[in-house]
Regions:
Chain B
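Conserved N-terminal structural module of periplasmic/extracytoplasmic solute-binding proteins
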Residues: 19-111, 115, 129, 176-177, ...
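Conserved C-terminal helix/tail region of periplasmic/extracytoplasmic solute-binding proteins
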Residues: 74, 78, 170, 355, ...
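Hinge/lid segment of periplasmic solute-binding proteins
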Residues: 81, 106-160, 215-216, 305-308
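A structural signal for short loop-to-beta-strand junctions that line the ligand-binding cleft
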Residues: 101, 130-169, 316-323, 393-400
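Short, solvent-exposed loop/beta-turn-alpha elements that line the ligand-binding surface or hinge
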Residues: 122-135, 179-180, 202, 223-250, ...
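Extracytoplasmic/periplasmic solute-binding protein
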Residues: 144-155, 160, 185-238, 283
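Glycine-centered hinge/linker elements that transmit conformational signals in sensory
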Residues: 188-193, 234-268
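Extracytoplasmic/periplasmic substrate-recognition and gating elements
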Residues: 261, 298-363
C-alpha cells in the first residue's frame, strides 16, 4: 500500500471505495450543520424577507405593499444618519484588533504579572451589558468623573456633554466597545499564536530580528487567517449584536443620533411594546443584511491572500 | 379450544372494564389550569416581594386563596421580565394559539393593537365590577365609553406628580404645603426663585428611560388641558393634525423656555442619576409616579413633599387634575379554554378584599370607589393621601393614547425640543407624517 | 526581551495594570452595592457601604430567590449548547478545512452568510415554529436557537484554525490505519484544541449571559434562566437594584470559572511541539 501513488489508488476499486467513503464522510459531517441552519436560520429569514414586502403587523394583517417599506424607511430623514452611525461604529474594529494584538504579544512574551492579566482581560465579556452601559454613561456623564478629571488638569473646555452630540457620543461608544472587546481579541489571537511552532521564532532570533520586527514581520503574517476571522466576527458583532449596549448607554439617542440599523429593528418590532411595524422591521433587517454582505465581500477581497479559497 | 375461548372472553371483559373505568374518570370534573402572566416589577408584584420566596408573594397567596375557593382550579404564575416585550410575546403566542389565559399588560393603545388575540369581555364582566371599579375607559377599544371591553384595569393606579424637597423650597422663601403654585405663572416664578438660590430647580433624566419623563408626567397634563384626550386621539388617528394643535405647540414652547431659563439641569437629555441627585438635595423637584414615594420618604423623611402640576390654562374644562390612572390591565386571551374562570380570577384580584390586602404591601391610589383612605390606614394630609384624592379625577395617560407611529416619534424626540435640537413644529409635523402613514 | 527599553516595558506594564483595574471595576461596583440597602444605593451608588453590610441580599438570593435552581437551568442551556456545538462543528470544520470537493467554497460561504442575520428578526418566526413543534418552554428551543446562531461563527473560527494543521500528520494517521473518527480524535482535536477551548469559553459565556432568547422561549418559572430572572427585578418604576447586583455577581461566578479553567489551555499549546 505504501508504495502506490495516489492516482493509482483512486483508479483502483479500493480507490473508488475510498472516494465513496470520503463522500459519505463529507456528507454526514456537513448534514447536521446544513439542516440546523436551514430550519432555524434560513427558513425564518425567508419568512422575514417575504414579510418585508407586506404591512405585517405581527398578527393577521399582511397585505402586499411591494417596496413601500424600504422606500419609506430610506426616505425618512433619519436614514442617512443611521447609516452613518452604523459605519462610524465600525471604526472600533481596527482599534480593537490593533490593541488586541499588542496585548496578545505582551501576554505571549510573559510580561510581569501576565498570569493576572490573562485571567482578568476577559472579565468585561462576562458582565452584563446593562451594567457596563450604565457605568459608562455615568463615567462620561456631564457631571461625571471623566469631566471632573479634565477640569482638574485644566482641560475644562473639553468637559462637554459627551453623550449629547452624535459624534462625541459615538466616540464614547466606540471606546466602550474597544474596552469590552480587548480581552476577546487577545485570547483569539493567542489561540492563533499557539499554533505557530516556536521554531519559527527561534529561527527569527537567529536571523537577528529584534522584537518588533519579529512581531510584525513574522507573527502577523502567520496570523492572517485568525485575524481575518476576528475582523469579520467583530465587524458582524458591531453591526448585529450591539443592541444591548446602545440600549443601556444611549437608547439610540439623543433622538436618533446614536441609533443604528440594528437598533431600529428593535425599535420597530419591540419598541415600547406595541410596535406594529414588523413589515418595516424586516425591511430594515434586509437592508442590514445587504450592508453586512457588502462589507464582508470588500473585506475578503482586500485580504485576498494566496490560498486555495479563491 | 374451549379454554382459548374462555380466555378470550375473560380478556375482552377485562379490557372492557378497564375502558369503562378510564372513561368514567374523564367524566369527572376536568381540572382547570390557568396560565397567568404577571408584570415582574411595575405592577402587582413589587420590589420588596421578590426578596421573599415565591410562595410568600402577595400574588401567590392571592392565588392560593382563589384556588381554595374554587377547587379543581390550578393557577400557574409566569413572571414577565420585560413588560414591553411582554406585549410582543403575547402577540406572538396569540398567533401560535397558545397565549396565556390571563395576562397583565398595559392599558390603552398597546392592548388595542392586540385586540385580534384578546377576548372581548363585554358579556363576561359582572355589573358590580363595572360599577365599583374605576378606569374602564382605559380598556375599552378606542377609549369609547361603549367600546368593546378588552380587559380589566389592574388593581392599582399611578398618579403623576412632582416630588419636592421642602427644605430647599423653604430656603427659597416659599411654603408649598400652605401655598402651592397653582398657575403656570406662579410655577414659573417659583422655579426662578429656586434657581436664584443656586439649586437646580428640576432634576430629571429626560431620555434615560426611553420616555420623556417630565413631559409625560407633567407637561402632558398641560397639553391635554388645552387639547383634551379626545382631541389627541383625533390627531393620532390622522383626522386632525398635531401641527395645528395650539395646545401641543404652546406646551412644547413653554417646555423649551424652561430649559432656556435654566429650570432643568443642563444635561437633561443624557443624565441618568437624577433620582440620586434629588435624594441628596441637589435638586428641588423630581417628576414621579406613586411608586417612588416610599423611597423618597425614606431618604428625605419629613422634607419629602408632593406637588401636583399647576394649571396651564385656568379656563380649561379639565382642572384640578393630573395625568394618571390605571396603566396596567388584565386581559384574557382569545384562545383560552376557560373564559369564565379567567374573568372570575381577574374579578377576584380586583375585589375589595384583595385590593385591601395588596395595598398593605404596595401603596398605590386604588381603582375602586368603595375603598376609603381610612380603610387603607392613610393619614389624612400625608403625601399618599394627597395623591389618593386624584384616584378618581385623574386624566388618563396621554402617551398611552398615541398609536405606535406618532408614539415612536414622541418618545424618542420630544426631549430634543427642550434642548433646542428640534422645534415644536418639527416634532408635530414628524408625528403627523407617521399618523398619516398608518 | 531584556533588549527592549526598560521605559517601554514599564509603560506597557503600567498601561496593562490600568486596564486591569478598569476591567475589574464593574465587579467592584456590583459588590459594594450588593451590600447596601436599596435606599442607600439610590443616595450614592459609588460610595462604600456605610450602614450595616446587607449580606441578606446574598442569602436571599440563595435561599429565597432560589438562584441555584436558576443556575441549573442556565447550565443546562449553556452546556447543552456548547456540547452539541462542538460535536457538530468539529466534524464540519474538519471537512471544510481538509477535504476538497466541489462546491466547498459555495457551501462554506452560504454557512457564513447566515451569520449576518440579526437575531431580533428571526425570533418571531422561530417562536411560531417552535410552538408548532411543541418545543416552547422546553430547553431545546433555546439550545437549537443558539446552535443556529453560533454555528457559522464557530465554524469560521475552527476552520481557520484547523487549516493550520499540517497535512502530513493526517496522512500519516491515515496510513497508520486511522479511520475518520480516529483521525479526528487523535489529530484534529489535539492540534486544534486552541479553537475548541476558545469556542467553549465564548459560547458557554454568551449563552449564559444571554437575556433575549430565553426570555421569549423559557417563560415558566421553573425553567427561567438566571439572567431572565434577574431582569425581572428592575422595572421602569420600581426595582430591587441591590438585590439584582448580588444576583449578577453570583451569576458571574460560573462564567468566570469556565473561563479560568479553559483559558490556561489555550496558551499551554505554545510549548508543545507539533511534530512528534
Amino acid at each position: 500500500m505504501t508504495h502506490t501513488t495516489r492516482a493509482s489508488l483512486r483508479d483502483s476499486a479500493i480507490g473508488r471505495k475510498r472516494t465513496r467513503i470520503k463522500r459519505l464522510e463529507i456528507f454526514l459531517s456537513l448534514l447536521p450543520v446544513v439542516l440546523i441552519l436551514l430550519v432555524f436560520r434560513v427558513y425564518p429569514i425567508v419568512t422575514a424577507l417575504a414579510k418585508s414586502f407586506t404591512n405585517w403587523d405581527g398578527l393577521y394583517r399582511s397585505d402586499w405593499v411591494g417596496l413601500r417599506n424600504y422606500v419609506t424607511f430610506v426616505q425618512e430623514g433619519t436614514f442617512w444618519m443611521i447609516l452613518r452611525n452604523t459605519l462610524i461604529l465600525l471604526l472600533n474594529v481596527p482599534l480593537q484588533v490593533f490593541i488586541g494584538i499588542v496585548v496578545a504579544l505582551l501576554l505571549y512574551e510573559r510580561v510581569a504579572g501576565w498570569r493576572i492579566y490573562r485571567a482578568v482581560i476577559y472579565t468585561p465579556q462576562i458582565i452584563s451589558a446593562v451594567i457596563i452601559g450604565f457605568l459608562f454613561k455615568i463615567f462620561f456623564g456631564f457631571e461625571g468623573p471623566f469631566n471632573a478629571v479634565l477640569k482638574a488638569v485644566g482641560l475644562g473646555t473639553l468637559a462637554i456633554e459627551w453623550f449629547g452630540n452624535s459624534y462625541t457620543a459615538l466616540g464614547v461608544i466606540v471606546f466602550s466597545i474597544v474596552w469590552f472587546s480587548i480581552g476577546w481579541q487577545a485570547i483569539v489571537i493567542l489561540g492563533g499564536m499557539s499554533s505557530i511552532p516556536p521554531s519559527v521564532f527561534e529561527a527569527a532570533v537567529i536571523d537577528g530580528a529584534n522584537y518588533w520586527q519579529r512581531a510584525f514581520r513574522i507573527v502577523i503574517p502567520m496570523l492572517v487567517r485568525v485575524l481575518e476571522f476576528s475582523i469579520i466576527a467583530s465587524g458582524v458583532w458591531t453591526l448585529t449584536q450591539l443592541f444591548p449596549f446602545l440600549f443601556a448607554m444611549t437608547k439610540g439617542g439623543p433622538g436618533y443620533e446614536t441609533s443604528t440599523l440594528d437598533y431600529m429593528i428593535y425599535l420597530k418590532s419591540y419598541g415600547l411594546g406595541f410596535g406594529r411595524d414588523y413589515g418595516t422591521a424586516t425591511a430594515v433587517a434586509m437592508i442590514l443584511l445587504l450592508l453586512v454582505l457588502a462589507l464582508t465581500v470588500i473585506e475578503m477581497r482586500l485580504a485576498n491572500r494566496a490560498d486555495d479559497w479563491g | 379450544m374451549k379454554r382459548l375461548f374462555t380466555f378470550s372472553l375473560l380478556l375482552v371483559f377485562l379490557l372492557a372494564s378497564v375502558a369503562i373505568t378510564l372513561s368514567s374518570c374523564g367524566g369527572k370534573k376536568e381540572a382547570v389550569k390557568l396560565t397567568v402572566w404577571m408584570n415582574g416589577a411595575d405592577s402587582i408584584i413589587g420590589p420588596t416581594e421578590q426578596q421573599k420566596p415565591q410562595d410568600q408573594w402577595y400574588v401567590s397567596q392571592a392565588f392560593r386563596r382563589f384556588e381554595k375557593a374554587n377547587p379543581g382550579v390550578t393557577l400557574e404564575l409566569v413572571v414577565q421580565a420585560d413588560q414591553g416585550a411582554a406585549h410582543t410575546n403575547f402577540k406572538t403566542a396569540g398567533l401560535a394559539g397558545n397565549a396565556p389565559d390571563v395576562a397583565n399588560l398595559w392599558t390603552g393603545q398597546p392592548i388595542f393593537a392586540l385586540k385580534e388575540v384578546i377576548l372581548s369581555l363585554d358579556k363576561l364582566v359582572p355589573a358590580d365590577d363595572l360599577k365599583y371599579i374605576v378606569g374602564w375607559e382605559s380598556v375599552r377599544d378606542g377609549f369609547k365609553p361603549d367600546g368593546t371591553i378588552l380587559g380589566y384595569p389592574a388593581a392599582q393606579n399611578q398618579i403623576c406628580h412632582m416630588l419636592y424637597n421642602k427644605a430647599i423650597v423653604k430656603k427659597a422663601g416659599m411654603d408649598w404645603e400652605a401655598n402651592p403654585p397653582r398657575t403656570i405663572e406662579e410655577f414659573d416664578s417659583a422655579l426662578a426663585k429656586i434657581k436664584a438660590i443656586g439649586v437646580t430647580p428640576i432634576v430629571v433624566d429626560e431620555a434615560a428611560q426611553g420616555v420623556p419623563w417630565f413631559f409625560c408626567w407633567v407637561a402632558d397634563y398641560w397639553w391635554t388641558q388645552m387639547t383634551t384626550n379626545d382631541g389627541i386621539l383625533e390627531e393620532t388617528y390622522g383626522r386632525k393634525k398635531f401641527a395645528e394643535d395650539k395646545g401641543f405647540l404652546a406646551t412644547l414652547a413653554y417646555y423649551r423656555s424652561m430649559y432656556v431659563k435654566g429650570f432643568f439641569r443642563k444635561d437633561l437629555t443624557t443624565a441618568n442619576d437624577s433620582f440620586t441627585q434629588f435624594l441628596n438635595g441637589k435638586g428641588a423637584l423630581w417628576p414621579a409616579v406613586t411608586s417612588f414615594l416610599a423611597d423618597a420618604e425614606k431618604s428625605l423623611g419629613a422634607d419629602c413633599g408632593v406637588l401636583l402640576p399647576p394649571e396651564f390654562d385656568p379656563n380649561a374644562k379639565l382642572v384640578n387634575s393630573t395625568v394618571g390612572g390605571p396603566g396596567q390591565s388584565f386581559v384574557v386571551a382569545k384562545n383560552t379554554k376557560y373564559p369564565q374562570m379567567a374573568v372570575k380570577l381577574i374579578s377576584f384580584l380586583n375585589s375589595k378584599a384583595e385590593v385591601l390586602a395588596a395595598q398593605k404591601i404596595n401603596r398605590y391610589p386604588i381603582v375602586r370607589t368603595d375603598v376609603t383612605p381610612e380603610e387603607m390606614g392613610w393619614v389624612p394630609g400625608s403625601n399618599i393621601a394627597k395623591l389618593h384624592k386624584y384616584s378618581t379625577t385623574y386624566n388618563y395617560w396621554v402617551d398611552n393614547l398615541l398609536t405606535s407611529g406618532p408614539a415612536e416619534i414622541f418618545y424618542t424626540q420630544t426631549s430634543l425640543v427642550a434642548v433646542g435640537k428640534m422645534t415644536p413644529l418639527q416634532l408635530a409635523e414628524a408625528m403627523d407624517k407617521k399618523a398619516a402613514a398608518q | 526581551m531584556a533588549r527592549r527599553g526598560i521605559a517601554k516595558q514599564v509603560t506597557l506594564s503600567l498601561l496593562l495594570a490600568i486596564l486591569t483595574v478598569t476591567f475589574l471595576y464593574p465587579l467592584y461596583f456590583m459588590l459594594i452595592n450588593s451590600l447596601k440597602s436599596r435606599t442607600e444605593y439610590f443616595v450614592n451608588p459609588f460610595s462604600l457601604p456605610r450602614g450595616a453590610l446587607q449580606f441578606e441580599n446574598y442569602s436571599t438570593m440563595i435561599s429565597q430567590f432560589k438562584i441555584l435552581n436558576l443556575f441549573k437551568n442556565s447550565f443546562f442551556v449553556s452546556a447543552g449548547t456548547v456540547v452539541l456545538l462542538l460535536v457538530v462543528c468539529v466534524f464540519a470544520s474538519y471537512v471544510f478545512a481538509k477535504y476538497r470537493f466541489r462546491g466547498r467554497t459555495a457551501i462554506y460561504l452560504a454557512v457564513l452568510t447566515t451569520m449576518f442575520i440579526p437575531s431580533q428578526v428571526t425570533i418571531i418566526p422561530l417562536y411560531v415554529l417552535f410552538s408548532k413543534m411543541g418545543l416552547v418552554n422546553r430547553y431545546w428551543s433555546v439550545i437549537l436557537s443558539y446552535l443556529a446562531l453560533f454555528l457559522p461563527e464557530a465554524i469560521l473560527l475552527m476552520t481557520a484554525n484547523f487549516r493550520a494543521i499540517i497535512d502530513e500528520l493526517l496522512e500519516a494517521a491515515e496510513m497508520d490505519g486511522c479511520g475518520y473518527f480516529q483521525r479526528v480524535r487523535h489529530v484534529v482535536v489535539p492540534m486544534g484544541r486552541a479553537a475548541i477551548f476558545l469556542s467553549i469559553i465564548f459560547y458557554f459565556i454568551t449563552a449564559w449571559n444571554d437575556l433575549f432568547t430565553p426570555m421569549i422561549f423559557l417563560q415558566s418559572m421553573d425553567k427561567r434562566t438566571v439572567m431572565v430572572a434577574l431582569a425581572a427585578l428592575m422595572g421602569r418604576y420600581t426595582g430591587a437594584p441591590t438585590l439584582q447586583f448580588a444576583g449578577l455577581l453570583l451569576s458571574a461566578v460560573p462564567a468566570l470559572v469556565v473561563y479560568i479553567i479553559f483559558q490556561r489551555h489555550i496558551i499551554r499549546g505554545l510549548s508543545v511541539g507539533a511534530i512528534k
